[in-house]
Amino acid sequence: MDNIKLQKLTESISESDFGLSFKHTAYFNPRLRTTGGRYLLGSHDIEINPKQFEKFGETALIDIIKHELCHYHLHIQRKGYKHKDADFKKLSQKVGAPRFCAAIENYEERANYIYKCLGCGETFKRIRKVNTRKMVCGKCKGKLHLHKHIK
């Protein structure tokens, strides 16, 4: 799917589920890493993470678009567009927009380092490096050492 098809899909979802037109731009942003999409308050554009579409397909993409359109339409109408606002919760429930999307990679897949406790032998996966002079094992308070650098 390209940006033109995404734009048309967003416009059609806006018309069918919200009964309102989407007058701005929706596009894929490959720089998004930890979020499914985002609504830009300044430009009113919607950015979508292309990895979500690649991994989970069109149904996940539609859910993300619905979620971002909730932000969009509420912000345009000067209502509560944040996740905590009652207007947002009510509208997202009405249109069936999920609160979260599935993670592209889980913590285990993102881990770069494996630490091992010298006391009990427990292993810990971490994304970032840990200061082994300060950090100790959570089980036995033993000393940690870098067992393996994965990536």
Swiss-Prot record:
Co-factor: note: Binds 1 zinc ion.
Keyword Kinase: no
UniProt cross-references to Pfam families, sorted A to Z: SprT-like (PF10263), Zn_ribbon_SprT (PF17283)
Segment forming the signal sequence: none
Ranges for domain SprT-like: 7-147
UniProt main location, coarse: cytoplasm
Compartmental location: Cytoplasm
Keyword set includes Oxidoreductase: no
UniProt entry keywords in alphabetical sequence: Cytoplasm, Metal-binding, Zinc
Annotated binding of Zn(2+), by residue: 67, 71
Any one annotated GO CC term: cytoplasm
GO molecular function terms listed in the Swiss-Prot or TrEMBL record: zinc ion binding
Obligatory cofactor(s): Zn(2+)
Swiss-Prot/TrEMBL GO biological process terms: response to stress
Active site (record annotation): 68
Family statement: Belongs to the SprT family.
NCBIfam families: PRK04351.1
Protein name per UniProt: Protein SprT-like
Organism encoding this protein: Staphylococcus carnosus (strain TM300)
